[in-house]
């Protein structure tokens, strides 16, 4: 009985460890917030949002 309980506990521990590794290595998809390029799947964090490419947003200033 003790061997069976230890085996089940060991298997559950391995499953929990694999789930933890999978969650910590997840990257952020395009359109979601980020804090650095390494958070994004495509490695472009632009204005705290994951983007496929980083372009300048807004209009140019015009001088009169």
UniProtKB/Swiss-Prot annotation:
Maturation-removed propeptide residues: 61-64
GO molecular function term, any single one: toxin activity
Organ and tissue specificity: Expressed by the venom duct.
Localization: Secreted
InterPro entries per record: Conotoxin-I_CS, Conotoxin_I2
One Pfam family, short name: Conotoxin_I2
Signal peptide as annotated in the record: 1-26
Disulfide linkage: 27-41, 34-46, 40-50, 45-54
Family statement drawn from the similarity comment of this UniProt entry: Belongs to the conotoxin I2 superfamily.
Entry text on domains: The cysteine framework is XI (C-C-CC-CC-C-C).
Protein name: Conotoxin Im11.4
Source organism of the structure: Conus imperialis
């Amino acid at each position: 009985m003790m061997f069976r309980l230890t085996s089940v506990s060991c298997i559950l521990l391995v499953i929990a460890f694999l789930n933890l590794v999978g969650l910590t290595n997840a990257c952020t998809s395009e359109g979601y917030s980020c804090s650095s390029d390494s958070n994004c799947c495509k490695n472009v964090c632009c204005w705290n949002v994951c983007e496929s490419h980083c372009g300048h947003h807004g209009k140019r200033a015009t001088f009169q």
